[in-house]
Swiss-Prot record:
Residues 1-19 form the signal peptide. Plays a role in male fertility. May have a role in sperm migration or binding to zona-intact eggs. Involved in the activation of the proacrosin/acrosin system. InterPro entries: Peptidase_S1_PA, Peptidase_S1_PA_chymotrypsin, Peptidase_S1A, Trypsin_dom. Keywords: Cytoplasmic vesicle, Disulfide bond, Fertilization, Metal-binding, Secreted, Signal. One of its GO terms (cellular component) is acrosomal vesicle. Belongs to the peptidase S1 family. This is Probable inactive serine protease 37.
């Protein structure tokens, strides 16, 4: 149910080559969707709204924001229940297309340095653009079920033609493909690479399990901006 790199299977050991991309608790727009089943990652797009993959529609969902480190509390932690979940009208559990949903929070998130909304893309991204990929992972000392770290890495966007030639991308529409060229600075067991951020705007969000090799497939958020904005109207 979540987007996972199995590092030893794909390419062995990953190392982060660009430490400048990393900082203390980056990606304050990421939220953790906690449930009794497999967890997922979403993006805060407004204080009261989260955008997430539709396959993350799970029972007993809780939205966690702010600091995720269980051993260190800093007052930014927030857990908010959803009061409304709207999946994209054309989404089907049997296909990876249109894998988007909007979650309305029971109360607006309190914004702080570790809780910030992310603007939506206003244009399509050009092939070759190097974008930021954000996700959640588990620190080496974390043996629990839930991730405790945010991580970023950089990767270039592929052209639609290149994407369609890959095994992962050939059956997708309204998709965004990225090619992973960075490597991790230390070994992780799992990495949930959930979002693509281009020029400080949300350009892509994970599509089910459709990642393999060195290519990641994401829903192209720009293609759905009208639906998102019409649905997530704060009254």
């Amino acid at each position: 149910m979540k987007f996972i790199f199995y590092l030893s299977v794909l390419t062995g050991t990953f190392l982060f080559a660009d430490s400048s991309v990393q900082k203390e608790d980056p990606a304050p727009y990421l939220v953790y969707l906690k449930s009794h089943f497999n967890p997922c990652v979403g993006v805060l797009i407004k204080p009261s709204w989260v955008l997430a993959p539709a396959h993350c529609y799970l029972p007993n969902l809780e939205v966690m924001l702010g600091n995720f480190k269980s051993r260190v509390r800093d007052g930014t932690e927030q857990t908010i229940n959803p009061i409304q979940i709207v999946r994209y009208w054309n989404y089907s559990d049997s296909a990876p297309q249109d894998d988007l949903m909007l979650i309305k929070l029971a109360k607006p998130a309190m914004l702080n340095p570790k809780v910030q909304p992310l603007p939506l893309a206003t244009t399509n991204v050009r092939p070759g653009t190097v974008c930021l990929l954000s996700g959640l992972d588990w620190s080496q000392e974390n043996s629990g079920r839930h991730p405790d770290l945010r991580q970023n890495l950089e990767a270039p966007v592929m052209s639609d033609k290149e994407c369609q030639k890959t095994e992962q991308g050939k059956s997708h529409r309204n998709s965004l493909c990225v090619k992973f060229v960075k490597v991790f600075s230390r070994i992780f067991g799992e990495v949930a690479v959930a979002t693509v951020i281009c020029k400080d705007k949300l350009q892509g969000i994970e599509v089910g399990h459709f990642m393999g090799g060195d290519v990641g497939i994401y829903t192209n958020v720009y293609k759905y901006v009208s639906w998102i904005e019409n649905t997530a109207k704060d009254k």
